[in-house]
């Protein structure tokens, strides 16, 4: 440290150490509007939620809390599940980070073992409305993580002769006496007509 030079414009190291000890720098995360009253915040949120619920109840004459229709301008009717479009009762999409298990294949992409069904996905599409939404999310997350570990995005090909999109061959390789030298087509190049710009 004896070779370190401090410029005249900067404060000396002793002064900086003393300043830091006397007045610690306040944290960057400051409360600009005073302390937060959590009870008041909770009351305001509950009041806002009640107001929204009452407004939607008046608008749609439906009690969303008890799942019952109310008297009003709309007439609610109970319908059979089969008469509804499929997107009303199909299972929800898995989260973006979750892996996808192919539905029509009975084995995984490497062909070694049967693919396990998705955690939380119902076995029968008819029973999707009966799925218990109170499953433990930590269990399903670990199950998905274990499931996704061995599955590849792109399946392994059995054909060992993979071909590049563009054949990167030079004229020397084409003029070789190799048996597959003429099998790759080459795009003819335009003769170079370059003009000088002045």
From Swiss-Prot:
The record's keywords, sorted A to Z, are: Cell cycle, Cytoplasm, Endosome, Nucleus, Phosphoprotein, Protein kinase inhibitor, Tumor suppressor, Ubl conjugation
Pfam families cross-referenced by the UniProt entry: CDI
* Name of the protein described by the UniProt record: Cyclin-dependent kinase inhibitor 1B
Q: How does it assemble?
A: Forms a ternary complex composed of CCNE1, CDK2 and CDKN1B. Interacts directly with CCNE1; the interaction is inhibited by CDK2-dependent phosphorylation on Thr-187. Interacts with COPS5, subunit of the COP9 signalosome complex; the interaction leads to CDKN1B degradation. Interacts with NUP50; the interaction leads to nuclear import and degradation of phosphorylated CDKN1B. Interacts with CCND1 and SNX6.
Q: Where is this region: Interaction with CDK2?
A: 51-91
**Biological role:** Important regulator of cell cycle progression. Inhibits the kinase activity of CDK2 bound to cyclin A, but has little inhibitory activity on CDK2 bound to SPDYA. Involved in G1 arrest. Potent inhibitor of cyclin E- and cyclin A-CDK2 complexes. Forms a complex with cyclin type D-CDK4 complexes and is involved in the assembly, stability, and modulation of CCND1-CDK4 complex activation. Acts either as an inhibitor or an activator of cyclin type D-CDK4 complexes depending on its phosphorylation state and/or stoichometry.
Q: Which residue ranges have biased composition labelled Polar residues?
A: 1-11, 175-186
| PTM remark | Phosphorylated; phosphorylation occurs on serine, threonine and tyrosine residues. Phosphorylation on Ser-10 is the major site of phosphorylation in resting cells, takes place at the G(0)-G(1) phase and leads to protein stability. Phosphorylation on other sites is greatly enhanced by mitogens, growth factors, cMYC and in certain cancer cell lines. The phosphorylated form found in the cytoplasm is inactivate. Phosphorylation on Thr-198 is required for interaction with 14-3-3 proteins. Phosphorylation on Thr-187, by CDK1 and CDK2 leads to protein ubiquitination and proteasomal degradation. Ubiquitinated; in the cytoplasm by the KPC complex (composed of RNF123/KPC1 and UBAC1/KPC2) and, in the nucleus, by SCF(SKP2). The latter requires prior phosphorylation on Thr-187. Ubiquitinated; by a TRIM21-containing SCF(SKP2)-like complex; leads to its degradation.
Q: What is the effect of changing residue 89 to F?
A: No effect on binding CDK2 complexes, reduced CDK4 binding and greatly inhibits CDK4 enzyme activity. No nuclear translocation. Inhibits in vitro phosphorylation of CDK4 by CCNH-CDK7. Completely abolishes CDK4 binding
> What Gene Ontology molecular function terms does this protein carry?
cyclin binding; cyclin-dependent protein kinase activating kinase regulator activity; cyclin-dependent protein serine/threonine kinase inhibitor activity; molecular adaptor activity; molecular function inhibitor activity; protein kinase binding; protein kinase inhibitor activity; protein phosphatase binding
Inducers of expression: Maximal levels in quiescence cells and early G(1). Levels decrease after mitogen stimulation as cells progress toward S-phase.
Q: Mutating residue 185 to A/D/Q: effect? A: Strongly reduced ubiquitination by a TRIM21-containing SCF(SKP2) complex
The Gene Ontology biological process terms listed for this entry are: autophagic cell death; cellular response to antibiotic; cellular response to lithium ion; cellular senescence; DNA damage response, signal transduction by p53 class mediator; epithelial cell apoptotic process; epithelial cell proliferation involved in prostate gland development; G1/S transition of mitotic cell cycle
Disulfide pairs here are: none
Extent of Basic and acidic residues compositional bias = 14-25, 126-137
Q: Which family does it belong to?
A: Belongs to the CDI family.
Q: Where is this region: Disordered?
A: 1-34, 85-198
Q: What is known of its domains?
A: A peptide sequence containing only AA 28-79 retains substantial Kip1 cyclin A/CDK2 inhibitory activity.
List residues, modification Phosphoserine: 10
Q: Which disease is it linked to?
A: Multiple endocrine neoplasia 4: Multiple endocrine neoplasia (MEN) syndromes are inherited cancer syndromes of the thyroid. MEN4 is a MEN-like syndrome with a phenotypic overlap of both MEN1 and MEN2.
Q: What else is known?
A: Decreased levels of p27Kip1, mainly due to proteasomal degradation, are found in various epithelial tumors originating from lung, breast, colon, ovary, esophagus, thyroid and prostate.
């Amino acid at each position: 440290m004896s070779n370190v030079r401090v410029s005249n414009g900067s404060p000396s190291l002793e002064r900086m150490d003393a300043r830091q000890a006397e007045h610690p720098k306040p944290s960057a995360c400051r409360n600009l509007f005073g302390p937060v009253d959590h009870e008041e915040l909770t009351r305001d949120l509950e009041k806002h939620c009640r107001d929204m619920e009452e407004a939607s109840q008046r608008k749609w004459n439906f009690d969303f809390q008890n799942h019952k229709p109310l008297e009003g301008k709309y007439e609610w009717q109970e319908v059979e599940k089969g008469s509804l479009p499929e997107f009303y009762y199909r299972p929800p999409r898995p989260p973006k980070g979750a892996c996808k298990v192919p539905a029509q294949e009975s084995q995984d992409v490497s062909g070694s073992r049967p693919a396990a069904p998705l955690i939380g996905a119902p076995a029968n599409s008819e029973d999707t409305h009966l799925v218990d939404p109170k499953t433990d999310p930590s269990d399903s997350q670990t199950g998905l993580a274990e499931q996704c570990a061995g599955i590849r995005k792109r399946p392994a090909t059995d054909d060992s002769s993979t071909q590049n999109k563009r054949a990167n061959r030079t004229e020397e390789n084409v003029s070789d006496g190799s048996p597959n030298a003429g099998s790759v087509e080459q795009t003819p190049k335009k003769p170079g007509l370059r003009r000088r710009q002045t």
